[in-house]
């Protein structure tokens, strides 16, 4: 009997335990590798800003680095369309084999890329192009892996089985942080010169292993059954988004599930790292170590909440996570500030910093295309304060008034960097978080709470998304809202939040972005999202 016939014969039955384990392991390992590749850039954003955006000031360079990071997210929905269509037409297995090769090659090339000092403006242009290739590949990876695992999972265990795919993003982040820390340790002062390239070059080894394992997989039984019955879609994109009954479900998935889930995930694993290092001035090595510890503690909960969704439903778990995110983000991040840099907290209470300026001279420093110039005295003052991690408030001055900075009782006219440094030093503002004063246990506890919230939203996600759509258009239909949510809502979280902080001076103001998104998702989900755990995905 042929392999095709053997697989087809089991299409309507559950997979064996050994086959299920192999499917989960092979799919998850490859997805861990893709997330490792994708997250490396985020872990090295500060270094990359110096290597590839050297022609601008430090704050603008960091914003550009975040924008390049976000560029990979922008194209993810397009990857979802391209590879989703292929996955629904030619099969799940071969499609997500292509995505892993594309991701691995693009990441390896980043490790070989000359810097701005070597080839000038071509360096950031090529970097962004490679980031976009990574995003294109990741746009096709998740839908393929989630669909493939779910279509092999026995009824009643889809949440548990697909939650392993959900945990891969966290494991990929953990792997990237561990590799970066190891490279920092072994290369020392040379890390920012050439050592940062090693994590990117190392990806070629992971690519070889992941590709070899995926080559041994068989096609999804549900897909083969559909093909044998002649029910495969000839135009999955048109069918997914051109028919209102399907488009309506896509929109519900985007606004009730993916938008909110995305910001909870990136708040817990990306924005928190930016917050600790950029605004609270924690030593990057310590911040990475505390995040690693938190991720190790939090990772199993992605599996737990996937399992729990098999017992009580997908919707209750997801809605609880969104509710907690909306209610707790401000208290959690204020707690991080208190336990990370108490000296900064005390100084800001005793000698608050106020920037008095004509609002027309102050720019909102969000520049997706890199053409704006932030060089007014107001912009320079705010850039300096944010670069130093100093919280401040803004006050409007009459039109045409020069900028004035107050540090407690000290007044400084215009942008005078020396005078500003002297004033903040006199007021007791620390230049960095004192490692001895960081309450490491409480920082880990608060990050773990963020991860638990993310796990509630992310753990049941793959099963829920697979169950919403029919087999013939499943890959395409679930991939697009997922990657719009994660690529746009989540991917721009660090950049938008950072720009909000620069504009207002309030290090917590950027949290309004995730709070609003999770709040909207909560309301839409409560009224529009249906429960799906009992759906028969083989026959819908």
Which residues make up each language-model segment?
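Extracytoplasmic gate region of multi-pass secondary transporters
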Residues: 41-42, 246-295, 332-333, 360-395, ...
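C-terminal ends and interior cores of transmembrane alpha-helices
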Residues: 54, 101-120, 323-343, 426-435
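Multi-pass alpha-helical transporter architecture, strongest
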Residues: 210-217, 332-339, 516-540
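Hydrophobic core of transmembrane alpha-helices in multi-pass small-molecule transporters
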Residues: 113, 119-139, 343-357, 440-456
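Extracellular/periplasmic helix-loop-helix junction of adjacent transmembrane segments
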Residues: 45-76
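Cytoplasmic membrane-interface "Motif A"-like loop-to-helix N-cap segments
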Residues: 89-101, 311-322
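Central cavity-lining transmembrane alpha-helices of secondary-active solute carriers
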Residues: 66-85, 104-106, 171, 292-305
């Amino acid at each position: 009997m042929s392999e095709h016939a053997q697989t087809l014969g089991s299409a309507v039955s559950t997979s064996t335990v050994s086959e299920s384990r192999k499917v989960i392991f092979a799919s998850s390992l490859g997805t861990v590798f893709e997330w490792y590749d994708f997250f490396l850039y985020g872990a090295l954003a500060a270094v990359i800003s110096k290597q590839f955006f050297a022609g601008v000031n430090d704050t603008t360079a960091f914003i550009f680095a975040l924008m390049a990071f976000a560029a990979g997210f922008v194209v993810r929905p397009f990857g979802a369309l391209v590879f989703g269509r292929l996955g629904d037409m030619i099969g799940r297995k071969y499609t997500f084999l292509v995505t892993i090769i594309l991701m691995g090659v693009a990441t390896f090339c980043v490790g070989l890329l000359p810097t701005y000092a070597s080839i000038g403006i071509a360096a950031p242009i090529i970097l962004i192009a490679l980031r976009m290739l990574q995003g294109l590949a990741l746009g096709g990876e998740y839908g393929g892996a989630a669909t493939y695992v779910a279509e092999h999972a026995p009824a009643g265990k889809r949440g548990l089985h697909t939650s392993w795919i959900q945990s891969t993003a966290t494991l990929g982040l953990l792997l990237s942080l561990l590799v970066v820390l190891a490279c920092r340790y072994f290369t020392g002062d040379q890390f920012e010169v050439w050592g940062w390239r090693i994590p990117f070059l190392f990806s070629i080894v992971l690519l070889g292993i992941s590709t070899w394992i995926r080559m041994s997989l068989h096609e999804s039984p549900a897909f083969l059954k559909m093909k044998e019955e002649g029910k495969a879609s000839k135009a999955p994109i048109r069918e997914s988004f051109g028919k209102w009954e399907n488009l309506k479900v896509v929109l519900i998935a985007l606004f009730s599930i993916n938008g909110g889930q995305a910001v909870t995930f990136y708040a817990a694993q990306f924005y928190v790292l930016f917050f600790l290092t950029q605004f609270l001035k924690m030593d990057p090595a310590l911040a990475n170590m505390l995040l690693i510890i938190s991720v190790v503690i939090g990772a199993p909960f992605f599996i737990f909440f996937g399992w729990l969704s098999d017992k009580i439903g997908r919707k209750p778990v997801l809605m609880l996570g969104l509710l907690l995110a909306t209610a707790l983000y401000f208290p959690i991040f204020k707690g991080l500030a208190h336990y990370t840099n108490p000296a900064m907290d005390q100084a800001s209470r005793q000698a608050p910093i106020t920037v008095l300026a004509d609002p027309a001279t102050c720019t909102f420093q969000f520049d997706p295309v890199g053409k704006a110039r932030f060089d007014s005295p107001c912009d320079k003052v705010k850039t300096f304060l944010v670069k130093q991690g100093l919280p401040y408030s803004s006050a409007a001055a009459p039109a045409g008034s020069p900028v004035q900075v107050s540090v407690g009782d000290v007044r400084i006219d215009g942008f005078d960097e020396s005078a500003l440094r002297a004033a903040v030093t006199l007021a007791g503002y620390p230049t960095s978080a004192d490692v001895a004063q960081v309450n490491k246990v409480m920082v880990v506890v608060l990050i773990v709470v963020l991860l638990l919230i993310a796990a509630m939203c992310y753990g049941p996600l793959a099963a829920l998304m697979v169950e919403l759509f029919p087999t013939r258009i499943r890959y395409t239909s679930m991939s697009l809202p997922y990657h719009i949510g994660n690529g746009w809502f989540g991917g721009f979280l660090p950049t938008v939040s950072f720009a909000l902080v620069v504009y207002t001076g309030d290090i917590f103001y950027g949290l309004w972005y995730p709070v609003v998104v999770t709040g909207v998702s909560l309301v839409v989900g409560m009224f529009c999202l249906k429960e799906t755990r009992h759906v028969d995905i083989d026959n819908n």
